[in-house]
Regions:
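Short, basic/aromatic recognition patches
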Residues: 1-21
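Alpha-helix boundary recognition
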Residues: 13-14, 60-61, 122-123
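Short amphipathic alpha-helical segments and helix-helix/interface helices
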Residues: 9-10, 56, 101, 119
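Charged, gly/pro-rich active-site loop segments
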Residues: 1-4, 78-168
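Alpha-helix boundary/capping residues
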Residues: 16, 62-63, 104-107
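Short beta-strand segments
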Residues: 17-51, 57-59, 65-71, 78-80
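Short, flexible segments with low predicted structural confidence
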Residues: 9, 30-32, 110
Length: 168
């Protein structure tokens, strides 16, 4: 599958309504995967765990994280990010970043509903975390578009040697 160009990746990560799944580790080493809202801002992925969310505790104890952002329709764009989550604002500092919270909510619901959501949950503390793209492992791909080679549907490493689309 072709890798997304830098502009395709930025456009995709800015597309409203696409959920992100985060993967982090529980204290016992078992994985925890959660679908959440996010925003791509200043070359980083920002997200906001609630005070009572299990994954906030996981990130506090081990900030290694995997992020999966993908779409359900053609061309099935995907971005996988593996890196370290960084705490930007802790619980109780919500007023310092509330405008970004509105922007995050506004990616998923209309502006009036986003404002209502923020106001209705204003007394519920959240933390603000991010994963910078620089310094993280970022992989992206999509289905081949019209006019692109059909063998691009898979990466070359997946074709068995000597088969139709293999290089050997």
């Amino acid at each position: 599958m072709p890798k997304l160009t830098a502009s395709e990746q930025t456009e995709f990560l800015s597309t409203p309504g696409i959920l992100m799944r985060i993967a982090c580790l529980r204290a016992d080493g078992s994985p925890l995967i959660t679908p959440i809202w996010f925003i791509h801002h200043e070359n980083a992925i920002y997200f906001t765990p609630r005070a009572q969310s299990e994954w906030l505790g996981c990130l506090r104890q081990d900030s290694r994280i995997g992020l999966c952002i993908d779409e359900q329709d053609l061309p099935y764009r995907k971005v996988i990010i593996e890196g370290q989550a960084e705490l930007i604002h802790d619980l109780g500092e919500d007023d310092l970043w509330r405008d970004l919270y509105r922007q995050i909510a506004g990616r998923y619901v209309p502006a009036d509903a986003a404002e209502a959501y923020v106001q209705n949950t204003i007394d519920q503390e959240r933390a603000l975390w991010c994963v910078p793209l620089t310094g993280s492992t970022v992989k992206s791909w999509r289905m081949p578009l019209d006019g692109e080679p059909a063998n691009g549907i898979w990466h070359q490493r997946y074709y068995a040697p000597g088969t139709h689309f293999s290089d050997s």
